[in-house]
């Protein structure tokens, strides 16, 4: 087992780290406060190839591996959880789905624009009555001649208000349950498609989280991904990969808060000495550090298994479950270390704590991850 990154992976990490520190960190507090989507940085990331790291050069990608992509999400999330999830949702949930399940025509038409960052992508599965119960889809798709007509709505869609390419799941045969769900590529300009309510959120406030509305939305027949009835399987396999991205986001948030806490402990003085000299806080730091390292190994292992085309579903669930819990614990402890200052916006740890919470919820709640893990263990 090799715990060293390759030269290429190190280069990706260093490049993204420098970008995160120089371009993302300076505006992180401002975009959180104003809920402003950081389009200028998304465009810069596109030019640097950061929106297509794991995709083949044939389709405009960087030709990197899964771990390189995960390292990028981690580094971005150290300074801004919002920026991390923008990249993760675009890459893991939309572009990767088309790469894995799309046909050559669909890849040629859509994947290149996504991999180069010319267009942003989003993933539309969650509905008002179908969150964890993804099988309870109410959006329907009816085939009429050379097109499908979609009716329904999706909620809590990351990148919803800024994406141009969407993956939408809809029922093509309600009588078949999960086997009646199909997946479609929908463009924002398709007739009958619109963006609904924009959510106001506790954390990741600068990400565009919206409702998607389809009223007699016309989708060309050729935009069906795979075959009718295969959508549920496509969604579940895609979410397996997406969970590694969110685990990387959680890992990055935890690392960012940890670094802030360590720096503060070295400079903050109480009773005539730095608070880093107090054993109680030293033990807290030791626990935070150890849990971050444990989370890192789970996340990197899941990424490596995915890259090797080995079974990774349970490993992705473990990584997301643990990294999310660690992110919540570490950010909360970081706020505690800062004391009253940690509760103010003068320091970034309160934002990091707010950003961390969502990692326990989206792309499968922690409870769902436990079901996946337990199901495997008890099989």
Residue ranges with predicted function:
Residues 117-125:
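A short, Trp-centered hydrophobic/proline-enriched beta-strand micro-motif
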Residues 146-147, 151-195:
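A short core secondary-structure module
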Residues 1-89, 101-106, 113-118, 131-134, ...:
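Alpha-helical interface subdomain recognition
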Residues 136, 189-220:
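Flexible, small-/acidic-enriched active-site or ligand-binding loops
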Residues 95-101, 123, 135:
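Flexible, glycine-rich active-site loops centered on histidine and acidic residues
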Residues 49, 73-77, 170, 186-191, ...:
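Short Ser/Thr-interspersed hydrophobic loop/turn segments at strand-loop and sheet-helix junctions
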Residues 64-65, 133-135, 159-164, 177-180, ...:
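Short glycine/proline-enriched turns and hinge-like loops at secondary-structure junctions
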Residues 87, 114, 129-132, 156-159, ...:
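Short Gly/Pro-enriched turn/cap motifs at secondary-structure boundaries
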